[in-house]
A protein has these predicted regions:
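N-terminal acidic, glycine/proline-rich low-complexity segments
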Residues: 1-160
Length: 160
């Protein structure tokens, strides 16, 4: 239970929430508001949100989908993109950005001050700075977004 998490897990990174002041109920919160509320209220270690507004600033480029996977016939990434929407389109990197933070830390990001995240019964997320808070959320400047996009492309297109 919580004791094992507290002993073994340093930080939980979640792609969830929105902290830009527009107050939407972000999809990953909205799909199960009570579960999201329980996580932010009871998680025993640090919690970092990679919010909606971060992902839309870091978009995986259609040019990479169209050009960087030619080495494999019917590459599953290319086929998934084609099945989802007509090409070409850039796609927000919500989950890849959260994964990069979870694995590599804050090299590519800004990180909020410590605080407390709350989730309303309608699914909106709010953040209040507090000195002993265990919650944070990620941000990117335009320069960081461009560098992170390039980094994600480099990771995704790497041939093993």
């Amino acid at each position: 239970g919580k004791e094992l998490i507290a002993e073994k897990v340093k930080t939980l990174v979640m792609m969830a929430g929105c902290f830009d002041g527009s107050n939407p109920s972000e999809y990953n919160v909205w799909k199960d508001i009570p579960a999201a509320q329980k996580i932010v209220a009871q998680w025993p270690t640090d919690l970092v949100f990679a919010p909606f507004e971060l992902g839309v600033q870091v978009c995986y480029p259609a040019t990479s989908i169209e050009n960087d996977f030619a080495w494999a016939e019917d590459h599953p990434v290319v086929e998934a993109y084609k099945a989802y929407l007509p090409m070409p389109y850039d796609r927000p990197c919500w989950d890849p950005a959260a994964l990069v933070y979870a694995v590599e830390g804050d090299k590519w990001f800004g990180v909020s001050d410590p605080g407390k995240i709350s989730i309303s019964d309608g699914g909106t997320t709010t953040f209040e700075v507090c000195e002993n808070g265990r919650h944070r959320y990620l941000t990117v400047t335009p320069e960081q977004a461009a560098a992170l996009t390039d980094h994600i492309v480099e990771i995704v297109t790497r041939q093993l």
